[in-house]
Regions:
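Charge-biased low-complexity segments
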Residues: 20-160
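Bacterial Sec-dependent N-terminal signal peptides
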Residues: 1-26
Length: 160
C-alpha cells in the first residue's frame, strides 16, 4: 500500500512539474504555435491565446488611456527602430496586430494581418522580421501578469 501511495504521489508531482514547464500553446496542426503568425492561420490556438492572456493593456494600465498609449507607442517605436537597425523597410506597412506579453514583459506571441491599404509586403519576410524583433525585444515593463493588446499599427509611427 505504501508503494502504491508513494508511486501515486511521485506521478502526481512529476505530472505537475512537466505541465508547468509546457505552457506552450499547440496550434491547429498539433505543432507548437509559432511566436509570430498571421491572424486566421491558427484559429483554435488563437482562442487559447486570448484565454491565457486575460488582461488587456488598457486594463493593466488601470484604464488610463495615456499610460496605455505610451506603452503601445514605445512598443511600435521599438519595432520601427529595430527595423531601421537591420535595414528592413517597414514604412508603408499597416496591419491589425495582437501582441501578448508574458509576466516578465517578454513577448510571447504576435499575431497580425496586413490591412488592405498596406503597401504590398511578403508576409513570410514580415513574420521573420517580427520573430527576430521579438527575440531581441527588451521589455519596457514587467506587468506581473500576462497582458494582451489588440490594435492596429502603421509605419512610420506618428505620435499624436
Amino acid at each position: 500500500m505504501k508503494k502504491i501511495l508513494l508511486l501515486s504521489i511521485s506521478f502526481f508531482f512529476a505530472t505537475a512539474i512537466f505541465a508547468k514547464n509546457t505552457n506552450e500553446i499547440v496550434g491547429d496542426s498539433g505543432k507548437t504555435l509559432p511566436k509570430v503568425f498571421l491572424l486566421g492561420e491558427y484559429n483554435n490556438a488563437y482562442e487559447k491565446i486570448q484565454n491565457s492572456h486575460p488582461t488587456s493593456l488598457f486594463e493593466y494600465c488601470n484604464n488610463n488611456p495615456d499610460e496605455a498609449f505610451d506603452k503601445w507607442a514605445r512598443f511600435l517605436i521599438g519595432m520601427e527602430v529595430y527595423a531601421e537597425s537591420i535595414n528592413y523597410d517597414i514604412k508603408g506597412v499597416k496591419m491589425w496586430i495582437e501582441v501578448c506579453w508574458e509576466n516578465d514583459g517578454k513577448l510571447k506571441y504576435i499575431a497580425y494581418a496586413p490591412k488592405p491599404e498596406s503597401r504590398n509586403i511578403d508576409t513570410k519576410e514580415l513574420s521573420g522580421f517580427m520573430s527576430s524583433f521579438s527575440n531581441h525585444y527588451n521589455p519596457q515593463f514587467s506587468p506581473g501578469k500576462r497582458v494582451i493588446q489588440n490594435s492596429h499599427a502603421s509605419f512610420p509611427f506618428l505620435s499624436r
